[in-house]
């Protein structure tokens, strides 16, 4: 059994980002940055509660805000997932691949990704109902799902889930800790950037546009980095023959 090394995984993630940035940067721009900026500029404006609003009014306002934002958030999530799959394909393809082939592969995988999303949502939901600890554990055990299906060209989502479970055996908590620490760092930085750009101006102003560009650029960079982290986790745990060494 390979013991997961967080430091080595982080170094490998940085190597992946630097080595392939000209190609993956374009994909990150198309699938991470553009959908994000489109949602920010074309999506519904934030709803502001009236002065002296009651808790019920605020709750109603929040639900309405969520309802309006949901289609945009769904579109951004779909685009981000497609982009991640295409980037993973470029990084993990056994015989090398082109950007066009990687994009085609990502679109072919849409049915598989939909089923994966539903199954994982159900599993995480059940785990969260039991206790938060099982849900955190599943983060580590399913971290290799998307790199696995991308590398091995798996169309069966259940094969990807079981493959990730086997691959991360004995390392679930280490991987979960690594991913959670990484996500906390991204969340803190995102909140800081958002707080700074939030003072640029209200929705519809020129300052808001500049702030949205900055926020979307940061989100795109983090999306690329998150994809690299998943790839690095998989690269460290996957075992290949001598003729199939990762480049």
Name what the model sees in each region:
Residues 1-247:
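Hydrophobic alpha-helical membrane segments
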């Amino acid at each position: 059994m390979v013991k997961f090394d967080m430091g080595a995984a982080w170094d490998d993630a940085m190597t992946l980002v630097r080595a392939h940035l000209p190609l993956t940067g374009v994909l990150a721009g198309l699938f991470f940055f553009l959908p994000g900026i489109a949602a920010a500029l074309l999506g519904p404006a934030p709803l502001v509660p009236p002065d002296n609003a009651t808790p019920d009014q605020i709750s109603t306002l929040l639900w309405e805000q969520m309802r309006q934002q949901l289609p945009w958030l769904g579109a951004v999530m779909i685009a981000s997932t497609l982009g991640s799959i295409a980037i993973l394909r470029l990084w993990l393809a056994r015989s090398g691949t082109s950007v066009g082939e990687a994009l085609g592969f990502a679109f072919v995988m849409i049915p598989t990704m939909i089923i994966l999303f539903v199954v994982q949502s159900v599993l995480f939901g059940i785990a969260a109902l039991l206790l938060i600890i099982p849900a955190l554990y599943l983060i580590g055990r399913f971290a290799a799902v998307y790199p696995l299906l991308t590398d091995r060209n798996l169309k069966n989502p259940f094969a990807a889930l079981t493959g990730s479970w086997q691959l991360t055996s004995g390392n679930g908590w280490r991987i979960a800790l690594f991913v959670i620490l990484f996500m906390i760092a991204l969340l803190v930085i995102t909140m800081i950037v958002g707080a700074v750009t939030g003072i640029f101006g209200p929705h519809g102003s020129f300052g808001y546009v500049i702030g949205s560009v900055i926020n979307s650029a940061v989100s795109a960079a983090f999306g690329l980095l998150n994809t690299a982290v998943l790839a690095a986790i998989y690269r460290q745990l996957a075992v290949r023959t001598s003729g199939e060494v990762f480049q």
